[in-house]
Structures are given as C-alpha cells and as structure tokens.
A protein has these predicted regions:
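Alpha-helical recognition/docking segments in bacterial nutrient-uptake
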Residues: 1-56, 60, 119-120
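Short acidic/polar active-site loop segments enriched in Thr and Asp
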Residues: 6, 63-65, 126
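Conserved functional loop/turn residues at catalytic and ligand-binding sites
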Residues: 4, 27, 62, 92, ...
Length: 220
C-alpha cells in the first residue's frame, strides 16, 4: 500500500520526476497512461496512427506544404514525428527542415512565436500542425496578427480534441483522444491487478483516436 491506496493510475505527470519513478518501481499495482514502462501495464493513445490519419486527411485536401510544430522530446512526440514523416514520404512530399519546429505542449506563447517564424519564410506552409489544441490557440493568434485568415489563407490542425476546440468557430480540425475509453481500461486493468495479481497479464494497450474534420483545413 502507498499512502493508504491499494493501487495507482498515473497520468498527466512528469514521468521523469524522481517521486513518480519511485512509485512506478515500487511493489504497488500501477497502471500508466500514455507512457510505457517495463513490467507495467500501460494504456496509450495510438499517437502514430492518429497523426497519420490527420496528415493523410490534410494531404487529401490538396496540401503538400505542411509544417509541424511538435512538443518536446518524449515517447509521444517521437511516435507522432515518425507517423508524420512516414506519411509524407509515402506521398513523395519533401518536408523542408525549416517546416519542423519544437515547442512545449500547451505552450501558447512559444507556439505563437514558432508560427510567426513559419509565416515569415520565403515559401511558407499552407497548413500548420500544432502539438495540441491548447497550444494551437497561440498559433491561431499569430496567424490573425499577421492579417491572415483561417482557413482561407492558412489551414491549421490541432491534436487532443479538447471540448473548446469543437465549440469555437471555425471548429478545429483535430484528433480526439478517446480519454473515456483509456480511463475505463486503466481502471479495469488496475482493479484486476489488485484483485488477481498472479493472473493479470502485464501488457500495453493502445486506443485509437478519432479524426474530427472540423473546418480549419481548406481544400487547395
């Protein structure tokens, strides 16, 4: 037991934090969300497929000049970057190095700066992918500050499918992570791990996201 708990679901934390690592390495039943550890059950969004579906949709809309502002290095970021590069390569689309920018997840200010830099390129992108829906608002503000319209002048897409993204106009093109299913699976796995530790399989479960076409990606 840990502070009176029989088990813990770990999500939305810094997985490099020493206290988190100590908990993961303890004897307590643990299930992690969106991070895989040896000998631990994990529930993760299928980030590679999610970004692949999103970029494929954008390409079908006629875009080839697609920039990607991604989050800091992590397993999630690496999966999404791999998916992005693979689908672009499958369509024989060369991605200029200056089209790839790094920022922090949920960082509106840094995302706005990265977006402004992309817009100032001699050959700017026609569509910009953001690390998440929240950070996307920084990019949207930068696009509007440049006197450009979404999606008429620049198309944009986010990731996560937060409720606000579906309520603003135009509605955000994004991938909705199935957090409800992920939470339910995490709870089910943790209960099984607590009640039947010797027979519960230690495995990693991936949950597909859902493409929300929205209205921020226009046809070229």
């Amino acid at each position: 037991r840990y502070r009176g708990f029989d088990g813990v679901v770990i999500a939305c934390v810094n997985f490099e934090d020493p206290e988190v690592i100590e908990l993961i390495e303890s004897n307590l039943p643990v299930v992690t969300i969106d991070r895989v550890f040896p000998n631990r059950i994990s529930i993760a969004s299928d980030n590679k497929k999610g970004i692949t579906d999103l970029v494929s949709y954008i390409i079908k809309k006629g875009h080839t000049k697609i920039a990607y502002i991604h989050g800091r290095d992590s397993a999630v970021t690496r999966q999404r970057l791999t998916g992005f590069r693979e689908v672009m390569r499958q369509h024989d689309i060369v991605v200029p190095q200056e089209y790839i920018r790094e920022t922090d997840y949920r960082d509106i200010q840094r995302t706005a700066i990265a977006t402004a830099e992309l817009l100032k390129l001699p050959d700017p992108p026609t569509c910009i992918l953001f690390p998440d829906d929240y950070a996307a608002y920084g990019g949207i503000n930068a696009i509007k500050a440049a006197g450009l319209r979404i999606p008429e002048d620049v198309s944009v897409a986010g990731y996560d499918g937060i409720s606000l993204a579906t309520k603003i106009e135009p509605k955000m093109t994004t991938i909705k992570q199935d957090t409800k299913t992920m939470g339910m699976l995490a709870a089910e796995k943790l209960i099984a791990l607590i009640e039947k530790p010797s027979t519960t399989e230690i495995t990693s479960v991936t949950v597909p996201g859902i493409l929300l076409p929205g209205a921020t990606v226009t046809s070229q």
